[in-house]
């Protein structure tokens, strides 16, 4: 794979990049050699990294082109970059050159391998205990322990309140200034512009809160007030800051200073958008309860647990914060709370210590893992006979029992394989294939979930009896659609597996003639 820089859209950013590389490259004289990448890419396996070098993911825009095997490779990267497992190199000023033959030469689809990493049974992301931690989980210690995707983005003073101190930007090297200018001109969003020497606290690890632990766009409703009116958190914070003698300020001063305990949650629609409606208890009876409406990806810092969210995959995409799942009874802490500031490294980031992902890679990992977890949970909770008695029936959606989340990853994977292998049309050998569904089975497959919801107290066998009675009462015209579909499936199965109808007799007495 060869990467070339597109210069027609962002010439200024490209020129600046080449200028910086020209100043730092030694022994380069020819104009063609200016395009040679002499830096040690931080995300390349086996390379030591230097903070002064330009990072490859900060280039203006890269486009994949077909390479000519007869030409020399420029900006040539091995196919396993950004997901190769390797020990993290330490940041040092002395970098060593690694021979080019250390790169793997076989072409591997990196996106496919990334999906395999994220959804494999051995993946740490697939462990169910990942979301059921009993020990305290703390998320961020210093930026040295963070990957670029997890570092907070530069905060614009025009959009949100407090920005980073001005002294912080004075400490940046000229190379960092050049990078920042190139990013702003080329429209690139860089999440790694913080210095590696800065200690990140609670406030710098996610977007600024407007009031307590709530972000911009949240709506509040205090139960203690005589008029339970909804108000935007921005308006509430503005009214409280304008006049300390304000009634709201006097009533809600110090509200939930020790955290807000989550009592209930539900999803609702507000102004045409899906939101979470959460009810919190401040811990004091005189303050009363609080109900809020917030976005689905809203992150919360939970006491003795760390960053949590109702939709961790959405939160990591929107805010770059890996989260656990939040549950009823969790205590959400405000910024500045001692339990939210003094913390160690996070077990969440232990998952990524052996992989160096880009922001897009990391988001894909969490999304794929979340999808795979949900699928395996649905495959494993249908009961021992459900998936085998009616192989083609869809999996129950209301099977999330409390004990199902405690199953180990290996047991989930085993059950998923068993359920998947019991499909109607086998893709392996003809000896293991099963007969396709007949007309009644197709009918039962279509209406089983509906009848299960109509009769919640009935088990699977009783539902089958009800479906059979309904099938007997149907007219031939109504059955015709299922009969034609069953014949089509049978013909296709015969074409793919001609020996599917040849039953193998056993020595059991029940099958003796």
From Swiss-Prot:
- One GO CC term on file: nucleus
* Matching Pfam families: AXH (PF08517), HMG_box (PF00505)
> What GO biological process term is on the record, naming one?
negative regulation of transcription by RNA polymerase II
Where is it located? Nucleus
Q: For this protein, what post-translational modification is recorded in UniProt? A: Ubiquitinated by the CTLH E3 ubiquitin-protein ligase complex, leading to subsequent proteasomal degradation.
Provide the free-text tissue specificity comment from this protein's UniProt record: Highly expressed in liver, adipose tissue, lung, brain, spleen, kidney, skeletal muscle and heart.
For this UniProt record, the keywords arranged alphabetically read as follows: DNA-binding, Nucleus, Repressor, Transcription, Transcription regulation, Ubl conjugation, Wnt signaling pathway
Induction field: Up-regulated by insulin in differentiated cultured adipocytes.
Biased composition (Basic and acidic residues) is annotated at: 165-181
- SUPFAM superfamilies (alphabetical): AXH domain (SSF102031), HMG-box (SSF47095)
Annotated region (Disordered), positions in chain: 151-181
GO molecular function (one): DNA-binding transcription factor activity, RNA polymerase II-specific
Please list the residue ranges annotated as the AXH domain: 202-343
Q: How does it assemble?
A: Binds TCF4. Binds RB1. Binds the second PAH repeat of SIN3A.
What is the official name of this protein in its record? HMG box-containing protein 1
Give the organism, scientific name.
Rattus norvegicus (Rat)
